[in-house]
Amino acid sequence: MIQPQTRLNVADNSGARELMCIRIIGASNRRYAHIGDIIVAVIKEALPSTSLERSEVVRAVIVRTCKELKCDDGIIIRYDDNAAVVIDQEGNPKGTRVFGAIAHELRELSFTKIVSLAPEVL
């Protein structure tokens, strides 16, 4: 469960390394965001000489959370970290690679571009 002020790892090669959640998109009074939700975040740590800089406000979609995720077939999935992929206004990823496993719920939420870049879909 991601709430404002939560720090997340970045699971792509967009240039950002760490994000901090500011707001959950599409929810005026929702407290937590889950896998597949879009958030507004600020970049807390970035690689030098990349297009994204520190303290820049970006949109990101959550791909992994430490909170357990119950699937329809009864399987419970829990990841080791909270991670997100930086996206643009149209929902396309800014990076060209995605690191680590992502949840299959992203395919159902029409983030097919992110799913196709991921090495493993759980």
Curated annotation (Swiss-Prot):
A GO molecular function term, named singly, is:
large ribosomal subunit rRNA binding
Q: Which GO terms describe its biological process?
A: translation
* Entries under InterPro entries matching the protein: Ribosomal_uL14, Ribosomal_uL14_bac-type, Ribosomal_uL14_CS, Ribosomal_uL14_sf
Reading the lineage from the top rank, the first entry is Eukaryota
Is the keyword RNA-binding in the record? yes
A single GO cellular-component term from the record reads:
chloroplast
* Alphabetic keyword roster: Chloroplast, Plastid, Ribonucleoprotein, Ribosomal protein, RNA-binding, rRNA-binding
> Which family is this sequence assigned to?
Belongs to the universal ribosomal protein uL14 family.
Protein's job: Binds to 23S rRNA.
Q: What is this protein called?
A: Large ribosomal subunit protein uL14c
Recorded source organism is Oenothera argillicola
Q: Encoded by which gene? A: rpl14
